[in-house]
Amino acid sequence: MKAKSAIESQKELLKKVIEVINNIKKEINIIDVYVVGSRARGDYLDTSDLDLVIISDDFKNLRYIERLEKLYKYSKGDIEFFAFTKEEWDNPKSLFIINMKREAKRLEDLAKSYDINF
């Protein structure tokens, strides 16, 4: 069982991420959002950052660095972004994305599991 401080850090970080996503939605048409890494697997510490996959077709024709530039201006420091189009996410051509998808949890589902509205 997770320590209370780790669970509280997960809830607080999820609330912060939802606020960040709502701000990003003002500029980018987001199709879906996934949490990956330790926060998705459940092996996080209370100091762990949150790895977030943003799916948007607004990323088409943008170099990867340009995608991240669009996202990082919204970052609160403890969020790591990954940015893919729907096609890249649905039909991955790299092991990196394939492995990411194995552990991915939809942000909306993860938030609900902590009784957080999204």
Show the residue positions of the predicted features.
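Catalytic core of pol beta-like nucleotidyltransferases
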Residues: 1-31, 41-46, 56-118
